[in-house]
Amino acid sequence: MNVPKNIIVHHTAVSREKNSNQFEATDNYHKSKGWGKIGYQYLIEPDGTVKQGRADNELGAHTSQKNMNYLSLGICLTGDFDIEEPTKEQCIALQELIRRKQTEYTILDANVVPHRHYAPKSCWGNKLPTDILSYLTKRTMADTQQLADWQNTAIQFIKDTGISDGSRPLETVTRVEMFEMIRKFYLYTVNKK
């Protein structure tokens, strides 16, 4: 019996525009590989509909590395997140599903990871950060949170100086990204003298 201690998030790697019925297509593809049925426990459609694949206690077929099929729930979002982002509805549904399953199975935040954490793939998409929970928090509150005047001023300065394009102002940055911003700011101040 599978008792999940991890949640692994995937994408179908098929653009929403190319196939609107990805649950059935994914199920058929997985069956063609001899897996019996869809390998994920859940699949989330663009409108936020959560579809059950395998039962939570059923062995998954989504992440073979480090026996993760035995130790995790596989949640897949429809879309190709190497070229597009999940819809807000998908983010809300994913966030709610993750929180519910974390409570149900005592899964730590650190154990909610993208597929690429275990496999040499881009999955859950190159356009998306590794920190799934922070990303979801920002995406689900983005429409309701207004930036303060000082924040808008700072963003405009960053855009005007070419340090950043100012997009996704509430998203965290890696140390390497911060170093690059500092380097650009240094060059801006040196050239301004």
Give the positions of each predicted feature.
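Glycan-recognition patch characteristic of GH18 chitinases/ENGases
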Residues: K18-K37, L43
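Structured segments of extracytoplasmic/periplasmic soluble domains
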Residues: T26-K33, A61, L97-E104, Y135, ...
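Short, flexible loop/turn motifs enriched in small residues
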Residues: G36, M68-Y70, W150
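Residue-level detector of short, conserved catalytic/binding motifs and their immediate flanks
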Residues: K5-I7, I38-Y40, L73, V176
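Stable alpha-helical elements in mature extracytoplasmic
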Residues: N19-Q22, T26, Q90-L97, W150-A154, ...
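Basic/polar, cationic surfaces and motifs that engage anionic cell-wall
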Residues: M1-R16, S20, P46-L71, L77-A142
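Surface-exposed patches in mature extracellular/periplasmic domains of secreted proteins
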Residues: G34-Q41, Y105-H115, S167
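Short, solvent-exposed alpha-helical surface patches in non-cytosolic proteins
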Residues: T140-K193
